[in-house]
């Protein structure tokens, strides 16, 4: 690729859309919300695997060229010098990404886990008449069944959390920068400076008081208006949780990245 490519990944409801909205203020950068590339990547891997009778005609070098070409063609019309592709799945693909893009880095957005669950439940409550794609458009359930669903190994949160731990403890952890939601909204300039330093990019003066991002059509189709809403001004807005106290406590010790003893690879965290 003629562009440099990096990845935004991490946990849901942790600021990845806000981060993309900020990064795209830089005319040299292209960034967006979660897109289809990670899914296409997985499909291609599956179709080139031994489950296909034609896999005998495909070796690893061809697989790599095909997957590399997927990125080249997807971003062929993008004039930006630096591309950021977003998906929670990228943390689980670091060995492949390291081979395809030796200079690529991954920015993983994280947040205190009970507030992720709280944020998803708040979306459900705010859209009481529109079942969400997050729960396969099912109108039933309670806050407890919804929390169990997203926290399960294949759930919106559980999969991303496990993928993050895989990347955090894996051999390519040096490619990883964790950006805490709490830092991003309370001190966005410090978070952005850390990202630019991590990527080796020249500084850019971002306007954190006038941020714009529009995904209303996508969110409406997902039955979850507000899913990718970004406030014009980046700021921390404390609020009480709407989760039952016992459910909140269930997740409040899950921020493993905050314990230095659990960071043997010295992953950078801002």
Walk through the language-model features, giving the residues of each:
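PAPS-dependent sulfotransferases, especially Golgi type II membrane carbohydrate sulfotransferases
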Residues: 1-6, 150-153, 158-174, 189, ...
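PAPS-dependent sulfotransferase catalytic core
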Residues: 1-70, 77, 125, 214-218
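PAPS/PAP-binding and catalytic site of the sulfotransferase fold
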Residues: 15-29, 97-101, 121, 178-203
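Conserved nucleotide-binding/hydrolysis micro-motifs of P-loop NTPases
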Residues: 36-38, 112-116, 184
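PAPS-dependent sulfotransferase catalytic domain
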Residues: 60-77, 118-198, 255
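Glycine-rich phosphate-binding loop used to anchor ATP phosphates in small-molecule kinases
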Residues: 70-96
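Conserved phosphate-donor/acceptor-positioning beta-strand/loop module used by diverse small-molecule
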Residues: 86-89, 97-123
């Amino acid at each position: 690729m003629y562009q440099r490519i990096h990845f935004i990944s991490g946990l849901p409801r942790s600021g990845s859309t806000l981060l993309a909205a900020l990064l795209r203020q830089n005319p040299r950068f292209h960034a967006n919300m979660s897109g289809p590339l990670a899914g296409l990547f997985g499909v291609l891997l599956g179709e080139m695997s031994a489950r296909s009778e034609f896999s005998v005609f495909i070796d690893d070098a061809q697989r790599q060229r095909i997957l590399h070409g997927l990125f080249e063609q997807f971003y062929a019309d993008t004039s930006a010098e630096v591309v950021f592709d977003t998906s929670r799945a990228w943390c689980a693909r670091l060995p492949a990404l390291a081979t395809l893009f030796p200079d690529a880095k991954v920015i993983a957005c994280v947040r205190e886990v009970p507030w992720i669950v709280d944020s998803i439940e708040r979306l459900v409550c705010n859209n009481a008449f529109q079942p969400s794609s997050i729960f396969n458009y099912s109108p039933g359930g309670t806050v407890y069944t919804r929390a169990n669903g997203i926290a399960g190994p294949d759930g919106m949160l559980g999969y991303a959390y496990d993928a993050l731990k895989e990347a955090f403890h894996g051999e390519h952890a040096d490619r990883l920068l964790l950006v805490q939601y709490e830092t991003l909204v309370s001190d966005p300039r410090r978070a952005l400076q850390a990202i630019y330093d991590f990527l080796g990019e020249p500084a850019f003066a971002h306007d954190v008081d006038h941020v714009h991002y529009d995904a209303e059509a996508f969110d409406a189709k997902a039955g979850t208006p507000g899913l990718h809403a970004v406030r014009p001004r980046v700021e921390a807005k404390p609020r009480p949780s709407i989760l039952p106290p016992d459910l909140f406590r269930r997740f409040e010790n899950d921020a493993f990245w905050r314990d230095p003893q659990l960071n043997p690879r010295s992953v950078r965290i801002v």
